[in-house]
Amino acid sequence: MEASEPVAETISKRFWTLIKMLRFYVVLRRFGYIDPLIYSIDPKQIKDVLSEALREFVSYTSSSSSRSIVIYDDPKNPVTAQAPCLVVAKRDEIPQNFPSIYRYTIYKIDKSSEYCISPLVVNDKYATLITPNESVIKEFFDKLDSNIQYARVLASLAVGGE
């Protein structure tokens, strides 16, 4: 396990946008993009899977709608912010514990029983959609060519929550 700790640290710091994008699919329970990262031994297959996940993610972003979400960073003083919602889900469509486990991906929509599912960075009253850029993707693919563990650790961090 010690050997993978530096990989996990590197991925958390350098590739956090990829983690957040994949976490979006975890919340949707779309593991077709997660499982190959864990089980594949072929970097090309992993790159193909990630490329497809990115294409679909771009499709989600292009059809997102803006909603007023509630941010509970300080439970005593919740804040509302406008945010792009990639998916709007009803309460019964989300497992009960997911909003607390994936609290930076699932947000309660203000004055509604629905949830906004989007990987966001929230600063004060501003919410920004997280999207991996081309240089991050290229760098990850380069790392993947030299160490297949990058894919497995990326998947583990995406499933892990927050």
Swiss-Prot record:
**In which domain of life is the source organism classified?**
Archaea
Read off the Pfam families from this record. Csa5_I-A
Q: List the disulfide bonds.
A: none
InterPro entries documented for this protein: Csa5_I-A
Keyword set for this entry? Answer: Antiviral defense
Q: Which GO terms describe its biological process?
A: defense response to virus
On whether Translocase is a keyword of this UniProt record, the answer is no
Q: Does the keyword Transmembrane helix apply?
A: no
Q: What does this protein do?
A: CRISPR (clustered regularly interspaced short palindromic repeat) is an adaptive immune system that provides protection against mobile genetic elements (viruses, transposable elements and conjugative plasmids). CRISPR clusters contain spacers, sequences complementary to antecedent mobile elements, and target invading nucleic acids. CRISPR clusters are transcribed and processed into CRISPR RNA (crRNA).
Complexes and interactors: Oligomerizes as an infinite helical thread in crystal structure; disrupting a potential salt bridge between Asp-35 and Arg-55 leads to altered elution from a sizing column. By immunoprecipitation Csa5 interacts weakly with a Cas5/Cas7 complex. There are 3 csa5, 3 cas5 and 2 cas7 genes in this organism; the immunoprecipitation studies may not distinguish between them.
What is this protein identified as? CRISPR type I-A cluster 1/Apern-associated protein Csa5-1
Organism of origin is Saccharolobus solfataricus (strain ATCC 35092 / DSM 1617 / JCM 11322 / P2)
